[in-house]
């Protein structure tokens, strides 16, 4: 258990440092410094120590064993770079909806996904990996349609033109508040937005 705990500590710290470096590259200094600090809390860290594999998130193992992941529920409610954080109900209807992520957290989500692929793929990592992971992911059904379209565009840009081009685009267009979907002529697919129950 101690060996797993130490390896988990090294993995999450390495991940944080990669995200920090990427966030700093686009000017997100505070977010770079505070990224994923909740992973060091006992609620999240103990799960990592117990289920650590080094090839994927320990939350997957906890979910398979318990039917849910307490660590993930704790994490997503405290970290705004996860699209799952951005769910609330509409005033009047009280129907839960997926909200569009603010630009700074969309950018941090991109950095988080890049770093995760770099950590888990190691020397085999390519700039296509985050885009391919998104395309094959089954856990994005509750993402806001505009957020999904923006994320897809940015990770596709990474796959086609590389990190330098993507980071420059984030600095010049995303973090300035520009509507990148209008800029690029992208129409979000609202048919993928999920129905939520009433509050």
Language-model features, listed with the residues they occupy:
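Metal-dependent phosphohydrolase cores
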Residues: 1-199
